[in-house]
């Protein structure tokens, strides 16, 4: 009986020794780190069997590291590396790279998504503006694209032929790794200044951006068409310099059809949620809520939810607004909880 108990115990120890294991990192940088650990020779010389053990392993939880376990009869070595995200640089990247650091960034989103899946990460770091020149459909299964040491716009539609559809992707405009004094260089998450089409579907989220001027979430001028569906969200975006359109700015004959989704928690001088300048918005559903305007000195703030104006006496950089008719039509949905801190228009403000 005693021999049987000892035999069972040894069998359990052998099975446990051969099991894949996860190594946990106390701290990891955005560009990864490598750590080696040495284990002493096991008590039983034949614990690993003949030929040793060489087995790749990974863990699915956030604190675990991907790596390789190698062992022979003398020792066991664990080499692990933290993969915190894949780096995407359309300007300087190369799809032959591994994408694990900024210096080895890949060039296309398709490759970045492929490597993110292979490495078990849900984060992609955007290191240069991504230009859309044709038709692109981004469905990333809930992954997040972060702004990484990137000033200006994150995504730019180059001309009227450009079309971008977003589904199940979070685009986070918060600067991932940059000194606070450089943060003022950032601008809109999406810029479309020469026409084009933008469609936001379920799971598309634009958030946490701070723009120097207009349209912190989306800047759309000169005939851009935007559609927003159920499950899409534009939230927590801000214009620092008291400009227009915390969530979206429409200008110069652009159109926005809101069939569903939510625009919330955005802030601007005018149009905390949406600013419609010489353009058209039709709201069929969804919610515009908890947006706000700044209280300024010497300059009024207005239209916390939606601001509508035939033209704006404003320009900046390559942005120039032209006098055009503006309209807002509400057929459904809700506008609630917005707050204008100066000239009024908590929900909708029309300015001629």
Question: What are the functions of these language-model segments?
Answer:
Residues 203-204, 215-217, 231-232, 245-247, ...:
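Periodic glycine anchor positions in long extracellular repeat architectures
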């Amino acid at each position: 009986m005693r021999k049987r108990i000892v035999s069972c115990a040894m069998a359990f120890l052998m099975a446990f020794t051969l099991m894949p294991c996860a190594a946990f990192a106390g701290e990891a940088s955005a560009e990864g780190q490598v750590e080696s650990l040495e284990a002493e020779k096991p008590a039983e010389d034949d614990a690993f069997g003949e030929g040793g053990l060489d087995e790749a392993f990974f863990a699915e939880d956030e604190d675990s590291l991907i790596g390789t376990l190698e062992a022979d009869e003398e020792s066991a070595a664990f080499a692990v590396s933290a993969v915190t995200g894949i780096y995407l640089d359309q300007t300087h990247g190369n799809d032959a790279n591994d994408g694990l650091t900024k210096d080895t960034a890949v060039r296309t989103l398709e490759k970045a998504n492929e490597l993110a899946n292979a490495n078990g990460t849900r984060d992609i770091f955007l290191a240069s503006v991504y230009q859309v020149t044709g038709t692109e459909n981004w469905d990333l299964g809930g992954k997040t694209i972060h702004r990484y040491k990137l000033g200006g716009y994150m995504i730019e539609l180059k001309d009227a032929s450009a079309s971008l559809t977003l589904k199940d992707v979070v685009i986070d405009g918060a600067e991932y790794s940059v000194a606070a004094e450089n943060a003022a260089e950032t601008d809109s998450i999406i810029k479309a200044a020469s026409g084009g089409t933008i469609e936001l579907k379920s799971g598309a989220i634009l958030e946490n951006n701070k723009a120097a001027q207009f349209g912190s979430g989306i800047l759309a001028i000169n005939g851009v068409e935007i559609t927003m569906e159920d499950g899409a969200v534009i939230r927590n975006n801000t214009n620092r310099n008291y400009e227009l359109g915390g969530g979206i700015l429409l200008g110069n004959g652009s159109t926005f059809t809101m069939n569903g989704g939510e625009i919330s928690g955005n802030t601007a001088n005018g149009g905390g949620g949406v600013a419609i300048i010489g353009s058209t918005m039709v709201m069929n559903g969804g919610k515009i809520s908890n947006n706000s305007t700044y209280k300024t000195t010497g300059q009024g703030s207005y239209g916390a939810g939606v601001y509508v104006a035939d033209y704006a006496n404003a320009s900046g950089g390559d942005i120039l607004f032209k006098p055009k008719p503006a309209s807002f039509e509400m057929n459904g949905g809700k506008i609630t909880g917005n707050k204008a801190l100066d000239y009024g228009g908590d929900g909708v403000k029309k300015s001629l």
